[in-house]
From Swiss-Prot:
Gene3D superfamilies: Glycosidases, Golgi alpha-mannosidase II, Oligo-1,6-glucosidase, Domain 2. This is Alpha-glucosidase MAL32. Its EC number is 3.2.1.20. It catalyses: Hydrolysis of terminal, non-reducing (1->4)-linked alpha-D-glucose residues with release of alpha-D-glucose. Keywords: Glycosidase, Hydrolase, Maltose metabolism. Belongs to the glycosyl hydrolase 13 family. It comes from the Eukaryota. The gene is MAL32. PANTHER family: ALPHA-AMYLASE FAMILY MEMBER, NEUTRAL AND BASIC AMINO ACID TRANSPORT PROTEIN RBAT. GO terms for cellular component: plasma membrane. InterPro entries: Glyco_hydro_13_cat_dom, Glyco_hydro_b, Glycoside_hydrolase_SF, O16G_dom_2. One of its GO terms (molecular function) is oligo-1,6-glucosidase activity. The active site is at 214 (nucleophile), 276 (proton donor). One of its GO terms (biological process) is sucrose catabolic process.
Amino acid sequence: MTISDHPETEPKWWKEATIYQIYPASFKDSNNDGWGDLKGITSKLQYIKDLGVDAIWVCPFYDSPQQDMGYDISNYEKVWPTYGTNEDCFELIDKTHKLGMKFITDLVINHCSTEHEWFKESRSSKTNPKRDWFFWRPPKGYDAEGKPIPPNNWKSFFGGSAWTFDETTNEFYLRLFASRQVDLNWENEDCRRAIFESAVGFWLDHGVDGFRIDTAGLYSKRPGLPDSPIFDKTSKLQHPNWGSHNGPRIHEYHQELHRFMKNRVKDGREIMTVGEVAHGSDNALYTSAARYEVSEVFSFTHVELGTSPFFRYNIVPFTLKQWKEAIASNFLFINGTDSWATTYIENHDQARSITRFADDSPKYRKISGKLLTLLECSLTGTLYVYQGQEIGQINFKEWPIEKYEDVDVKNNYEIIKKSFGKNSKEMKDFFKGIALLSRDHSRTPMPWTKDKPNAGFTGPDVKPWFFLNESFEQGINVEQESRDDDSVLNFWKRALQARKKYKELMIYGYDFQFIDLDSDQIFSFTKEYEDKTLFAALNFSGEEIEFSLPREGASLSFILGNYDDTDVSSRVLKPWEGRIYLVK
């Protein structure tokens, strides 16, 4: 195949961009109230620019009661006062642009907060004009104790039933996530129009360049909201994906949203969208340029490997081969199409990648963190880097339940305690699971300095909203890593420079082929672009190992590696060593 057979290589700013994700609560506190804020982000824009990224994606900063850290929005057009003002946000957008970067915001429109005015109206009576903007259903019946039975057997993503009973009108409302995070009914055209105008149009008018679309595969539910088939025989409640994911009108809705954005923007700027679709085989449909839906998607296959499909905190063993195939599934579908892909291994919903997929021991933390950097920077698709990932942040160690903040952890802890007891095997397994997999590992405050107690995130006399990961005392902080040429931070800068220099192969490379796929130590592959070939050899083990050449007699020209004192002509890789070559 030639370049003409690969429409996915058509250049776009959002394909070539490296996008830095910011979790505002934990990034930088500018006013010493213990919470990160928008002015804090603005104060660190030069740091972000110097890293070598091209855009920032800021997680929800909208007004919210914060049941789920801002993903429960009560007003799409207003900044949560703890984060600042609308003017602070407009200033952040403007200064981001002045530094030559794009600004992407989170679009959370599958659900809103029960504190949103739309829901307050809807719940007020069964005849309210906005009643049908949400999913209201009467009880299926009543149990022996007289308690109302939910309308179907769907389980919330956060545990328990996906339905909450509201005594105002004695009906249940659907909420696939937290109890006060109520699902919007996209079947209602007036509801869709209001969502587009308030959540999308308002921010397009103020200059945003794109949206990360939260839970983008959930807007079209299965008609009638029927009971799910029994997939998990250990539970009466069933995972909601069957009834809520990739429903019959999902692509129609995304095309409508795309048209709204295109018609709203009058200055010619190209808006990018990345849809969090999680699972399924529709990725090529979502991202086909000819279908006008979303620019690219986040798939969860590679980051959910090692977890149970029925309960995210049940640890399941997996092999390197399985992980290699899962990672490749993120971009193989675009080969020879007009679709596009993403590459990421961390975000605000995932634990730290070094702990999960490499080696966070003091001996190998840095070198294995750099190995993951090499892997990510060499993969096809738009690259995302999550705050703290660039300094090699790792999971915190052995925290008691009282230190966790995540509503998902708290809900499941209470469910397990009630069902099995505090000292049960199930509870012990749960603690092992959250130690490896909890979202809280990615949400601890950003360590800017080595200074105790708050590492420069907030003032030394301030109590931060969340505990810091103690790793800042072991050198995992921006201040010390900036001065250390051998740090993970400075390696990220070099790797991003290489990704730009070799963008044809690293970003747009096609015809991906595994080398030694069955190896449970070596992750190696080739990619092509016109007459050029990239070869990556990555050792995902603590032992020395020899790699295979991409073809017999191949001549290799070294691009980048994570060991400074290595013989790049040798085919033996040191523990957790990775190298990227051009094949001649």
